């Protein structure tokens, strides 16, 4: 059964932080339930648990998986960021190597005993790639939607366009429906993406250490990234499956949910079929 969203505490960055999370089809005591694949959903740069809408439930129901959706610090109903917070160029690495492991531990998820499936969108996809490269034995497979593997001019230009006063105001009003404090996280996120220090950020070398299957998905109309993002994954990780979706922008799970659910089912079944 699916549980209601809740909060769990972690220690990070010298303080206690409450993280919003939700289990989907959580263990109800059925025999063999613990062996059911667990998919962890990692949201985009301005996303949250609630902003996934019902896509995680759709995917888990179709693929007969358990799911875990988490809002990172500052996002959704998690502990808000203090006003004026600014992130360094390693902000995605810190989320992957510090926050995600702490969240999994706090929730009792032992990825050493049962490797995870990670499904990340945009910044969340980058976090998934970094985590899989650092902890290859803990990841069964990756699904990355519109990932950022390096910084492109079109990404920076699209984020810069959000700074126009009327655009910013409208965006913050929409985000207020999903975040306790949208302005600090928007400012921290947009500031680092627009900083000169971040222009040379890349995870190209890290990705070569990924050992699990990867399904990399990009919309052909994505204003935040080109197909070179997922093609760079294919060059780094042998056997990567690429899915290029027409009539699809930066959010494949919103623009083409049925195609994505079908692709994940095929991807999961192929991987599970490799097991003895």
Q: Where is each model-derived feature located?
A:
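A short loop-to-beta-strand scaffold at the N-terminal edge of the catalytic core in hydrolase folds
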Residues: 14-29
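Conserved HGGG/HGGXW glycine-rich cap/lid loop of the alpha/beta-hydrolase fold
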Residues: 25-82
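Active-site loop/oxyanion-hole signature of alpha/beta-hydrolase fold enzymes
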Residues: 69-116
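Conserved hydrolase catalytic core segment
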Residues: 112-152
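Short beta-strand/loop motif that positions the catalytic acidic residue
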Residues: 210, 216-218
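Acidic catalytic loop of the alpha/beta-hydrolase fold
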Residues: 220-225
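Catalytic active-site module of serine/aspartate enzymes centered on a nucleophile-bearing elbow/loop
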Residues: 246-276
């Amino acid at each position: 059964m699916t549980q209601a969203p809740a909060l769990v505490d972690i220690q990070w960055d010298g303080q206690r932080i409450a993280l919003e999370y939700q289990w989907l089809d959580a263990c109800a005591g059925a025999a063999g339930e613990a062996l059911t694949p667990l998919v962890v959903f990692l949201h985009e740069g301005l996303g949250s648990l609630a902003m996934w809408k019902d896509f995680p439930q759709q995917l888990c129901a179709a693929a007969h998986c358990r799911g875990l959706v988490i809002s990172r610090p500052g996002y959704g109903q998690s502990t808000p960021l203090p006003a004026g917070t600014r992130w360094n160029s390693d902000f995605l690495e810190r989320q992957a190597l510090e926050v995600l492991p702490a969240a999994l531990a706090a929730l009792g998820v032992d990825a050493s005993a049962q490797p995870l499936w990670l499904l990340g969108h945009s910044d969340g996809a980058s976090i998934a790639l970094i985590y899989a490269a650092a902890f290859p034995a803990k990841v069964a497979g990756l699904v990355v939607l519109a990932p950022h593997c390096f910084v492109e001019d079109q990404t920076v230009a699209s984020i810069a366009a959000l700074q126009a006063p009327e655009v910013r105001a409208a965006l913050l009003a929409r985000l207020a429906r999903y975040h306790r404090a949208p302005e600090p996280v928007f400012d921290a996120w947009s500031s680092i993406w627009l900083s000169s220090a971040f222009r040379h950020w890349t995870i190209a070398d890290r990705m070569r250490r990924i050992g699990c299957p990867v399904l990399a998905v990009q919309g052909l109309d994505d204003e935040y990234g080109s197909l070179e993002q997922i093609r760079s994954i294919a060059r780094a990780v042998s056997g990567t499956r690429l899915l290029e979706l027409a009539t699809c922008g930066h959010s494949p799970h919103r623009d083409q949910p049925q195609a994505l659910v079908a692709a994940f089912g095929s991807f999961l079944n192929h991987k599970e079929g490799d097991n003895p």
